[in-house]
Design a protein with these regions (language model features):
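Short secondary-structure boundary/capping elements
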Residues: 24-28, 69-70
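Mid-chain, well-packed structural core segment of small domains
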Residues: 46-47, 52-92
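A short beta-strand-loop structural module common to alpha/beta enzyme folds
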Residues: 11-23
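C-terminal binding/interaction regions
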Residues: 72-129
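Short, structured active-site "lid" loops
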Residues: 27-50
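Short amphipathic alpha-helical segments
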Residues: 1-3, 56-60, 100-101
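Glycine-rich phosphate/diphosphate-binding loop of Rossmann-like nucleotide-binding domains
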Residues: 1-11
Length: 129
């Protein structure tokens, strides 16, 4: 995945196992999410066996909207309607070909607007924690 992103011209900061660090998925997902929330990275991609754990961990960081995507259309919608900024993937379910499709859809789409009130409600709930 890192090679695919770099081949498409994206600057990639590696965390956890992708950086040859012996770090579990939870702390790695939080580090990625913090980089996105701090605007040190525009977007983040996190992976674990199901994708669920990393999406939960990343979503604990204020300002992060992590979306677990198993196909390109879900990835496209997560960016367009939810302004998701962290992509979570399942290592078990996502083949290399599907990962390429998901990444292309994710990177090719931006927030389309029209969901500002819903996103503001999510942000308000986040602040109320």
């Amino acid at each position: 995945m890192v090679e695919l992103l770099e081949a498409r011209g994206h600057a990639v900061t590696r965390f956890g196992r992708a950086a040859d660090e012996d770090e579990a998925w939870g702390p790695t997902a939080v580090r990625v999410a913090r980089a996105v929330a701090a605007r040190d990275a525009d977007l983040g991609v996190v992976c674990c066996w199901t994708g669920t754990g990393v999406s939960i961990a990343a979503n604990k960081v204020p300002g992060v909207r992590a979306a677990l995507c198993t196909d390109a259309e879900t990835a496209r919608g997560a960016r367009r309607w939810n302004d998701a900024n962290v992509l979570a993937l399942s290592l078990r379910l996502t083949s290399e070909e599907i990962a390429k499709e998901i990444l292309d859809a994710w990177l090719g789409e931006g927030y389309g607007g029209g969901e500002d009130a819903s996103l503001a409600a999510v942000t308000d709930a986040e602040k109320a924690r």
